[in-house]
From Swiss-Prot:
GO terms for biological process: DNA catabolic process. Transmembrane segments: none annotated. It catalyses: Exonucleolytic cleavage in either 5'- to 3'- or 3'- to 5'-direction to yield nucleoside 5'-phosphates. Its EC number is 3.1.11.6. The keyword Nuclease applies. This is Exodeoxyribonuclease 7 large subunit. HAMAP family: Exonuc_7_L. Its main location: cytoplasm. GO terms for cellular component: cytoplasm; exodeoxyribonuclease VII complex. It comes from Enterococcus faecalis (strain ATCC 700802 / V583). Keywords: Cytoplasm, Exonuclease, Hydrolase, Nuclease. It comes from the Bacteria. InterPro entries: Exonuc_VII_L, Exonuc_VII_lsu_C, OB-fold_nuc-bd_dom. Heterooligomer composed of large and small subunits. The lineage of its organism: Bacteria, Bacillati, Bacillota, Bacilli, Lactobacillales.
Length: 448
């Protein structure tokens, strides 16, 4: 019997007819993960669907792709409806997809990504965050009344900062009603206005379990709250939208409590250390001021007070001397002028000239008297002012405020090195003197 050999084309066409005629392959419901996806604008889409053990090529025509309500991405798990056929040019079978939608968890991830993008554009993630108070008095806890979360928070707060008051707002944290309950309790706690901090959260779980904390309404309630919020949802690797919107994110409930309150003993120790430093600073400042006072007290101003007004006394003497010299000079000048006038009058015999000269002489005498009086008054004012200035600088004024000076044998004592035990001293005050005997002498240490 002679064997009949088929061409590759003939075999491929035969197999294609088999594929197209099979009723089970005419409408296939398939689930898998998108692979090798490269988006092509305004064109047919070519990619693969795979699972853990197999892969199939997929084609989605432009008309079907434009009807999708989501954007397919690499690694997304989807459910598709289509037909299986053979592509003759390559001899491989493939699915022609007519409809596609995210599969289960994949849909949640898709919705989560879209919501993140939306809220991110609105600035809910990057907006200004509220600072947590350092010493909170009341803390609101929005979580389930049962479970490890509330126990961990209570234990941590009592251990670190037992003076803080925890107020639990029992809340559903899983299920269809959870998101509304979370929003309601956030708003209740925030409306009371007497909470310093708010902690919201729950334990770990699947994305479906954590989904209430990915709801848009929860994110907006957190963003609108005026109370600083710490979010602790799931495990450390779980990051929900609530975590991203909250003022602070904590990896665990224990970490949330640690962020909310300080360690009381450490704060008390810090306060004690600061008080000690303050006391030391005060004592150091007091010592500096005391030493400065002692240096001033021992300065020449108090030891030799007459030196304060030596210069002013000399200046006053010079001014007084110039005053008398000026008055004498003016008097002599006017006297000479008067004598000259008298001599001229004596030489003139007419009575009219004599009378006129007498009148002129009287006028000059009055003018001289006025000028001398005015000059004397001016000099007297200058003298009085100088005396007042000297009086302000007088050591008697200083002694009148409680200061004194000491003499030994009518000599001012300037230093303790001039004294010996049993010396007799005279202490001078503003209103009298006191006699004293030296018993002990204590020299001041030198300053370096």
């Amino acid at each position: 019997m002679t064997q009949q050999y088929l061409t590759v084309t003939a075999l491929t066409k035969y197999l294609k007819r088999k594929f197209d005629a099979d009723p089970y392959l005419g409408r296939v419901y398939l689930t898998g993960e998108i692979s090798n996806f490269r988006f092509r604008a305004n064109a047919h889409q070519y990619f693969s669907l795979k699972d853990d053990h197999a892969k199939i090529s997929a084609i989605m025509f432009k008309s079907a792709f434009q009807k999708l309500k989501f954007q397919p991405k690499e690694g997304m798990k989807v459910m598709v409806v289509g037909r299986i056929s053979l592509y003759e040019n390559s001899g491989s079978y493939q699915i022609y997809i007519e409809h596609m939608e995210p599969d289960g968890v994949g849909a949640l991830y898709q919705a989560l990504a879209e919501l993140r993008e939306k809220l991110g554009k609105e600035g809910l993630f990057e907006g200004p965050k509220q600072q947590l108070p350092r010493y909170p008095k009341r803390i609101a806890v929005v979580t389930s009344p049962s479970g490890a979360v509330i126990r961990d928070i209570i234990t941590t707060v009592k251990r670190r900062y037992p003076i803080a008051q925890l107020v639990l707002f029992p809340t559903l944290v899983q299920g269809e009603q959870a998101a509304d309950d979370i929003v309601r309790n956030i708003q209740r706690a925030d409306a009371q206005s007497d909470f310093d901090t708010m902690i919201i959260g729950r334990g770990g779980g699947s994305i479906e379990d954590l989904w209430p904390f990915n709801e848009e309404k929860v994110a907006r309630a957190i963003h609108a709250a005026t109370t600083p919020i710490i979010s602790s949802v799931g495990h450390e690797t779980d990051v929900t939208i609530a975590d991203m919107v909250a003022d602070v994110r904590a990896a665990t409930p224990t970490a949330a409590a640690e962020l909310a309150v300080p360690v009381l003993n450490e704060e008390l120790l810090r306060i004690s250390e600061r008080r000690s430093r303050l006391e030391q600073s005060f004592l150091y400042l007091l010592q500096q001021r005391t030493e400065r006072f002692q240096r001033l007290q021992n300065s020449y101003v108090f030891k030799q007070p007459e030196r304060l007004y030596e210069g002013q006394t000399i200046k006053l003497d010079r001014m007084t001397q110039r005053l008398f010299q000026a008055m004498t000079t003016i008097h002599h000048q006017k006297q000479r002028q008067a004598q000259g006038i008298i001599a001229q009058l004596q030489q003139q015999t007419p009575k009219g000239q004599l009378r006129e000269s007498q009148q002129q002489l009287a006028f000059l005498q009055r003018n001289l008297q006025t000028q001398m009086t005015q000059l004397f008054l001016n000099k007297q004012k200058q003298f009085t002012s100088a005396v007042q200035q000297l009086d302000l600088l007088s050591p008697l004024k200083i002694m009148g405020r409680g200061y004194s000076y000491t003499t030994k044998e009518d000599r001012v004592v300037k230093t303790v090195t001039e004294l010996q035990p049993a010396d007799q001293l005279t202490i001078h005050y503003a209103d009298g003197t006191v006699q004293a005997n030296v018993e002990t002498i204590t020299a001041k240490k030198e300053e370096f």
